Design a protein with these regions (language model features):
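Helical hydrophobic small-molecule/effector-binding pocket
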Residues: 80-106, 122, 164, 168-171, ...
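Conserved NTP phosphate-binding and transfer environment spanning the P-loop NTPase/kinase superfamily
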Residues: 172, 180-189
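Short, charged helix-capping/linker segments at alpha-helix termini
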Residues: 25-26, 142-150
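Amphipathic alpha-helical packing segments from all-alpha helical-bundle domains
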Residues: 92-96, 103, 112-141, 150-157
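Short, basic, alpha-helical segments at the C-terminal edge of helix-turn-helix-like DNA-binding modules
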Residues: 59-65
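N-terminal intrinsically disordered/low-complexity leader segments
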Residues: 1-6, 144-146, 193-207
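Hydrophobic alpha-helical connector segments
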Residues: 56, 70-96, 152-156
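Helix-turn-helix
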Residues: 10, 14-52, 56
Length: 207
C-alpha cells in the first residue's frame, strides 16, 4: 500500500529529477506520486494544481543553479567575474539536464506559463539585486560612468537578459564580458582593471 505522507522537499526533489530527465512538460501529479510510492492525494496536499508543482520545480532549478554558488558575494570579486560565475552556474545546471529546458517551458499550457511567470519575477528581482550589489561594491569600477544607460538599475537587467538569451541560443557571453570590461573599467598597462586590480576582501554577504 502506498505511503500517505511525504516531506514536501523530497517531493520537489523527485519532481525536479523527473523534469530534468523527461522534461517539465512530461511531469504530472500521477507520475510524481507513482515515483514516490504515495497516493495522488498526498501530492495534492502540497500542490493543489499542476501549475503549482511546475512553479516549485522552476524555483528548485534556480535554487540549485544559483543560491549555493552565486548568492554569497564578497568585496574581492569584480563585477565581470561575478557575471561570468552567474552565467557559468546557469549553464552548468542546464547542461545536467537531458532535455532542452527552455523548449520544454515553451510547450507548457497557459496556466503553467502564468505560474512560471509568477515564480520567476521574485527570482529575477533577487538576481538583479545581487548584480547591483556586486557592481556598486566593485572598487575597480569607474563609478562616475554608472549613469544613464549604464546605471545599475538599467545595466543589471540588461546583463541578466543577455545571459538568458545566450543560454536559449546556446551562445557564449564573451562579447558581453568584453563590453563590460571596456565600459566600466579604466584600461591599465597589462589589461583592463577588472582583471588586474585586486580589492581588499570584505565580510561575506548574502545577496
Amino acid at each position: 500500500m502506498p505511503k500517505q505522507v511525504i516531506d514536501k522537499d523530497k517531493l520537489v526533489d523527485q519532481a525536479y529529477s523527473i523534469a530534468a530527465r523527461e522534461g517539465i512538460s512530461a511531469l504530472s501529479v500521477r507520475k510524481l506520486a507513482a515515483a514516490c510510492g504515495i497516493a495522488v492525494g498526498s501530492v495534492y496536499m502540497y500542490f493543489p494544481t499542476k501549475a503549482d508543482l511546475t512553479a516549485a520545480v522552476f524555483r528548485r532549478f534556480f535554487g540549485q543553479a544559483l543560491f549555493e554558488e552565486c548568492c554569497r558575494v564578497d568585496g574581492s570579486e569584480s563585477f565581470v567575474d561575478y557575471v561570468r560565475k552567474l552565467r557559468g552556474a546557469l549553464g552548468e545546471a542546464l547542461a545536467q539536464m537531458d532535455v532542452d529546458w527552455f523548449a520544454e517551458m515553451r510547450r507548457l499550457p497557459r496556466s503553467e506559463h502564468e505560474a512560471l511567470e509568477a515564480a520567476r519575477g521574485p527570482m529575477l528581482a533577487h538576481m538583479e539585486q545581487g548584480l547591483q550589489h556586486v557592481l556598486e561594491a566593485d572598487p575597480a569600477v569607474v563609478h562616475s560612468r554608472l549613469v544613464g544607460a549604464l546605471s545599475p538599475e538599467k545595466l543589471c537587467p540588461f546583463v541578466l537578459g543577455t545571459i538568458f538569451t545566450s543560454l536559449m541560443e546556446g551562445s557564449d557571453c564573451e562579447p558581453l564580458f568584453a563590453l563590460l570590461d571596456a565600459s566600466l573599467y579604466e584600461a591599465v598597462a597589462d589589461g583592463v582593471a577588472s582583471g588586474s586590480v585586486a580589492a581588499a576582501p570584505d565580510e561575506m554577504k548574502d545577496c
